[in-house]
Regions:
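Acidic, glycine-enriched catalytic cores built around paired aspartates
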Residues: 29-212
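Catalytic or ion-translocation cores adjacent to nucleophile or general acid/base/metal-coordination motifs
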Residues: 2-38
Length: 212
């Protein structure tokens, strides 16, 4: 395998423009296609499961972790300059080594979470095929990357254009980023305030198959 993981932030994510561009593409794709993602994980059994029984909620949001959320905030403010790094976890047991704590942490209440160097889509039921989800995920991200390519290929100053594109994209789509408790009633109210869809069943999701 000689490929490059485009979602690997590296040691200094704030300096990794390639990673930030692909991160922005995923954020935009998820925000613009949340209803289709919800549809891809929908059947009567899974509709009942979502939001309970250790399953993520039906509202689509992205968990980035403290490090990447801080970087997104810096980008939006226009002062990107640093990356938060993981702290050490001291168990208090002297015979055990001090453990490195992941800077992205974990949030099991998130339906779409960044975990180190990849995203996890966690809504799909165990009995469901991953084919539909993969088709939707790959298509929606490819569509956004195609839009990015069209814009960047005609840029006179590529570096300036890509930085501006990243800032514009995450600013417009940061509403879908949520690092808190996806099970809470407060999140349902906050998601509605942000304009995020709350598609509660397969029947409600069907009309989105024919929307633009």
């Amino acid at each position: 395998d000689t490929g490059i993981n485009l979602l690997d932030p590296g040691k200094k994510p704030h300096e990794n423009t390639k990673f930030l561009l692909f991160l922005a593409a995923v954020i935009k794709a998820v925000d613009e296609n949340a209803e289709l993602l919800r549809l891809s994980a929908s059947n009567p059994g899974n509709d009942h499961r979502l939001g309970a029984n250790e399953a993520p909620p039906a509202i689509i949001s992205i968990f980035l972790g403290e490090q990447l959320e801080d970087i997104i905030e810096q980008i939006v403010r226009g002062d990107l300059s640093s990356s938060i790094h993981g702290t050490k976890l001291d168990t208090g047991v002297h015979v055990l080594p001090v453990l490195r704590k992941d800077a992205t942490d974990r949030n099991r209440t998130s339906p779409f979470a960044f975990t180190g160097n990849k995203f996890e889509f966690r809504m799909l039921g165990s009995s469901m095929s991953i084919a539909g989800v993969n088709f939707i995920l790959n298509t929606m991200v490819a569509d956004v990357l195609n839009q990015f390519a069209d814009e960047l290929e005609k840029a006179d100053d590529f570096d300036a254009a890509v930085n501006e594109l990243i800032k514009k994209t995450v600013t417009e789509h940061q509403r879908v980023i949520f690092n808190g408790d996806g099970y809470s009633d407060e999140w349902v109210a906050e998601a509605e305030k942000r304009g995020l869809p709350n598609v509660k069943s397969f029947v409600e999701a069907i009309p989105y198959l024919v929307t633009d």
